[in-house]
Amino acid sequence: MRIHDLDPQERPRERFMISGVSSLSSAELLALIIKTGTKRKNILETCQDLIGRNGLEKLADLSMRELQETDGIGPAKAMQIQAVFELQKRLHFSRNTNKKVRSARDVFDYMYGRVPDESKEHLFVLHLNTKNQIISHHLISVGTLNASLIHPREIYKSAIRESSHAIILVHNHPSGDVEPSNADKQVTSILEHAGSILQINLLDHIITGRDAWFSFREHELLT
């Protein structure tokens, strides 16, 4: 069925005009953006299929190739979908500029969307000023955290350059299990000692998963 064959009150554009944007489903919102379907399926059916098979969270992370596995989604529509989610990420980033850290949850929220590939471990250092506001962040390494590979010099070099009052380490666990490994604890201990010498406080080390986090500070693993 073509979109124009639907009852006017069921068409996304008309529903938008009558009831407002918040009344639309996720599939209807996406249909407004990519607009056209195929001879086999109208655009609303295509978007319902796309979201139904993936969910919004997974959809936001799909590659161009993965998006095009859905019938009716070609390169142009895949680019439109990726552009929408990229704008959403940038809005989130802009709202978190100079974010004040009061808890590990603040750091978890700040890091949303900043890990480019969740299938690999990424170690970041966040630089904070005297008000505990995040002034910048820096990607240190990609790969399994290991004390023999992570040198304090690499961590604190950027902190000195940014005139940081304190730093927070953040790294992700692709498995989703946020419990710290022995290597995580060893790296944290080494970096906390180095920070005390440089008088740059290691405020926290936070391990993130998909929907959870572990804070060394909140679990009293930092002095």
From Swiss-Prot:
Residues 100-222 form the MPN domain. InterPro entries: MPN, RadC_JAB, RuvA_2-like, UPF0758, UPF0758_CS, UPF0758_N. It holds the Pfam family UPF0758_N. Zn(2+) binds at H171, H173, D184. PROSITE patterns: MPN, UPF0758. Keywords: Hydrolase, Metal-binding, Metalloprotease, Protease, Zinc. A motif (JAMM motif) lies at residues 171-184. Signal peptide: none annotated. One of its GO terms (molecular function) is metal ion binding. It comes from the Bacteria. One of its GO terms (biological process) is proteolysis. Belongs to the UPF0758 family. This is UPF0758 protein Cphamn1_0831. The lineage of its organism: Bacteria, Pseudomonadati, Chlorobiota, Chlorobiia, Chlorobiales.
